[in-house]
């Protein structure tokens, strides 16, 4: 019998600013072992909050290979500031508004039943809201990012 499991949810980025810190995200389905992970965020700490600045990051992982993009735009300034980035070693990234500094960058450390684990190569104390979608099951094979 073939199976396909999909789960979506939200978690908050760790506020531990130690480089190399791991963060476990527990899934509602304890039997689901992810084969595909999507992460996306607008780098906000409050849902549905208005900000003059725009930040967006989204990324993908197959558990071995990660890739993400990030863009930020600082508006209501004399000169608008825009930064973009692509990371072949990360699944989610955030920049410091108004600079070219990456303030947080995570890759996938592992997939296992009922969870995925991120490693924050760069971290800060901002509790960004991050959304995820995972897929798993026997119907999914040969996933490549």
Question: What do these predicted ranges mean?
Answer:
Residues 1-145:
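Surface-exposed molecular-recognition determinants
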